[in-house]
Swiss-Prot record:
Similarity section: Belongs to the TMEM231 family.
GO biological process: camera-type eye development; cilium assembly; embryonic digit morphogenesis; neuroepithelial cell differentiation; regulation of protein localization; smoothened signaling pathway; vasculature development
Pfam families linked: TM231 (PF10149)
Originating organism: Gallus gallus (Chicken)
A GO CC term assigned to this protein in UniProt: ciliary transition zone
Record-given protein name: Transmembrane protein 231
Residues that carry a glycan: 195, 200, 222
Known role: Transmembrane component of the tectonic-like complex, a complex localized at the transition zone of primary cilia and acting as a barrier that prevents diffusion of transmembrane proteins between the cilia and plasma membranes. Required for ciliogenesis and sonic hedgehog/SHH signaling.
InterPro entries assigned to the protein according to its UniProt record, in alphabetical order: TMEM231
Disulfide bonds: none
Zinc-finger found in the keyword field: no
Subunit (UniProt): Part of the tectonic-like complex (also named B9 complex).
Domain of life the protein comes from: Eukaryota
Transmembrane segment boundaries: 23-43, 266-286
Length: 320
């Protein structure tokens, strides 16, 4: 029997054969192209075919590093401030403007999942009766880590700043340490590019402790943390012998992390879109193929199966 089998269908009980260079074979090739290529074009042109970014939720592992830099403004003049930090080189530069505060900190794991959920921070700055605080600038340094996809480790900061024309007795802040991304994280591997100190605590130069320079260098990072408290509370009415107090609660919330998907995740996402469109084309062109071969639009050789005789009929035929 000449040719090769081009098409068969259980409902037709017939196989159709023709040569490889016949019109029927070329028609079958065209139908195959029209079945599989257009779904790919439709999925691609509908946008979102290739997954360029993805997201997941994770609570970061955050710990306070017990490193800070504190500046209290006491007047309008350029040298009217008191300062202290955990960096000895910075403290040596302050001379008579150095004032050592009393600190108390406590990190709390509220849901007992092994990760800290918030930091309670309190700073008490002793003041002379003639000294008044009209502004506060505070940098707190944290260790910030993500583990679910890639392992991302960095040193980050919370920056708290407030000024008032009225001298205060206490500044109260309560907010979240929010992750800020300008770049997607990797889907796997170890990323420690920002695991460096926010403040160069060993430098003897005053410019390295200038808050403007510290903030500018920190903002150059593609991944940072920002302390979000749009409504800090400034309290007034400090007693003559009472310290100025900074009282802050910094929460470590669950974050939505944006990352660059890996190869297999991208393929899986594209495959789902392609197959969902392909099923429609398979159904349509399957009916077209059945019509073409059943109605002999192109010349083929139908081959019908030879059904076996029934055992009863076979027995009767052999009876004498």
């Amino acid at each position: 029997m000449a040719g090769v089998e081009l098409f068969s269908h259980p409902a037709l009980h017939t196989r159709y054969r023709a040569g490889l260079c016949s019109a029927a074979a070329l028609a079958l090739l065209l139908i195959a192209v029209l079945t599989y290529v257009p779904p790919l074009l439709v999925a691609y042109r509908s946008h979102g075919f290739w997954l360029k970014q993805s997201a997941y939720r994770e609570q970061p592992t955050v710990r306070f590093r017990y490193e800070l830099l504190f500046v209290a403004t006491t007047g309008p003049g350029p040298g009217s401030f008191l300062a202290w930090s955990t960096f000895p080189a910075f403290n040596r530069l302050q001379e008579d403007r150095l004032r050592v505060p009393l600190l108390s900190t406590r990190e709390e794991d509220k849901n007992q999942d092994g990760k800290m959920d918030q930091l309670h921070f309190k700073l008490e700055l002793p003041l002379q009766p003639t000294e008044h605080v009209v502004g506060v600038q505070l940098i707190l340094i944290f260790s910030y880590q993500l583990y679910r996809m890639s392992t991302f480790v960095m040193q980050s900061m919370a920056f708290l700043q407030f000024f008032s024309p009225v001298p205060g007795s206490q500044l109260y802040a309560n907010g979240d340490l929010k992750l800020n991304q300008r770049q997607l994280l990797n889907h796997c591997g170890l990323d420690t590019r920002y695991n460096v100190s926010v403040v160069n605590g060993t430098s003897p130069f005053a410019s390295d402790y200038d808050l403007k320079n510290i903030i500018a260098a920190y903002r150059d990072r593609n991944v940072t943390t920002v302390f979000s408290d749009s409504n800090p509370i400034w309290m007034t009415g400090r007693g003559a012998n009472t310290p100025f107090i900074v009282n802050a609660t910094i929460r470590y919330p669950v974050e939505v992390i944006l990352y660059q998907p890996g190869f297999w995740e991208t393929i899986k996402f594209a495959w789902i879109q392609y197959v969902s469109i392909l099923l429609i084309f398979l159904w349509v062109f399957g009916r077209i193929k059945m019509f073409v071969f059943q109605n002999q639009v192109f010349a083929t050789t139908p081959v019908s199966p030879v059904l076996p005789l029934s055992p009863v009929l076979s027995y009767k035929q052999h009876q004498p």
